[in-house]
């Protein structure tokens, strides 16, 4: 049964019209704590960091940590409980029917501590007034690539039309994607249950690095099969739960990829990396899809690479260009703004400039 929408249909467009600027910056606040790794495992304290980030950045959006390890850790724990280091685990043979069965049977199992804290933090924020509680999850394709030792070769073979029954690498990719979808949907349902009104689904692997633009141009359905169809199923999960999709892809994208993500998946918000010229991408994006991004915050740590004055000028330029397009737009970071030891104040100054520079 489909639940009522948790947000007004124009919620993000209204924020864009009001000129909202916000980084994905909770990691900076987390690392101001004396024990950030302990905070990651404590839902109440993690919610405090999320709320403090929203207050500092003057945004109504409660944006969680972009920790894309959570779903993989839970999945590996479910199907390979003896694995000590899930971050580095890869399947060396295609996941079996038994693996898929274990993943389905684990639907109601407890989440690992970091994932549990993430869910508890969403619930804590959702219980407070004045903030829009967002969730965060890795996308199905990006999770699948993390389950393979050589995802590029596997996806390339699939893109050439090689069948799973003829090539173990293709079977490995297809089976891993099926497992990834189960893990992502389980996470999405849990985040909706916790109170998320929208979920940021991160698909950085949906890019020219992992999916061949040449194969797509030649008519291969590889992007459709491995990226778009799983994303559409994830969006349907969110739609059924009454929540919006914020689709984040900071990978290197072609024009065709941007157009497909925007028009086929049609998220409420499309967040892109700094390689894209958003004022040109408006021609590819439906008018009701808010563009989000895309200052090069991965370089904020270095004054040599990206001086403060350059951040100010980039901010002015992007805001001005996007205003001229009249397309709904929220100025933000190209990805999550990560804490870098010894560069914290440098990064914070640039984030503040991004938020305050007049245009």
Regions found by a protein language model. Give the residues of each.
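Catalytic domains of carbohydrate-active enzymes, especially glycoside hydrolases
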Residues: 47-68, 189-198, 260-269
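N-terminal small/glycine-rich loop or linker at the start of catalytic domains
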Residues: 7-39, 74-81, 132-174, 205-214, ...
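Alpha-helix-loop-beta-strand connector modules within alpha/beta enzyme cores
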Residues: 114-130, 215-243, 350-359
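Conserved, mostly hydrophobic/aromatic
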Residues: 54, 125, 184, 191, ...
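Catalytic-face loop-and-helix region of soluble metabolic enzyme cores
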Residues: 3-14, 31-32, 232, 236-359
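Active-site-proximal, glycine-rich beta->alpha crossover segments in alpha/beta enzymes
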Residues: 80-190, 218-222
């Amino acid at each position: 049964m489909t639940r009522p929408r948790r947000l007004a249909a124009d919620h993000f467009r209204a924020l864009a019209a009001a000129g909202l600027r916000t980084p994905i910056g909770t990691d900076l606040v987390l690392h101001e704590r004396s024990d950030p790794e302990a905070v990651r495992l404590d839902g109440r304290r993690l919610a405090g960091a999320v709320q403090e980030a929203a207050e500092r950045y003057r945004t109504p959006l409660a944006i969680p940590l972009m920790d894309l390890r959570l779903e993989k850790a839970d999945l590996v724990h479910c199907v390979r409980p003896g694995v000590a280091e899930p971050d580095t685990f890869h399947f060396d043979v295609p996941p079996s029917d038994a693996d898929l069965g274990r993943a389905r049977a684990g639907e109601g199992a407890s989440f690992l501590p970091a994932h549990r804290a993430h869910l508890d933090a969403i619930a804590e924020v959702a219980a407070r007034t004045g903030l829009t509680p967002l969730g965060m999850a890795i996308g199905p394709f990006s999770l699948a690539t993390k389950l393979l030792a050589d995802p590029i070769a596997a996806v390339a073979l699939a893109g050439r039309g090689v069948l799973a029954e003829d090539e173990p690498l293709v079977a490995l990719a297809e089976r891993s994607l099926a497992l990834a979808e189960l893990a992502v949907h389980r996470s999405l349902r849990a985040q909706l249950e916790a109170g998320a009104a929208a979920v940021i689904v991160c698909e950085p692997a949906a890019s020219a690095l992992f999916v061949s633009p040449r194969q797509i141009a030649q008519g291969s359905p590889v992007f459709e099969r491995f990226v778009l169809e799983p994303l559409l199923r994830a969006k349907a999960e969110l739609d059924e739960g009454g929540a919006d999709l914020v689709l984040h892809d900071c990978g290197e994208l072609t024009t065709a990829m941007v157009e497909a993500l925007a028009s086929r998946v049609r998220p409420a918000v499309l967040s892109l990396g700094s390689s894209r010229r958003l004022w040109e991408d408006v021609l590819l994006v439906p008018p009701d899809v808010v563009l989000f991004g895309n200052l090069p915050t991965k370089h904020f740590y270095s004054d040599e690479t990206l001086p403060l004055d350059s951040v100010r000028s980039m901010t002015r330029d992007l805001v001005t260009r996007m205003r001229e397009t009249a397309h709904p737009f929220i100025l933000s970071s190209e990805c999550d703004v990560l804490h870098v030891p010894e560069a914290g104040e440098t990064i914070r100054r640039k984030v503040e400039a991004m938020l305050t520079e007049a245009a």
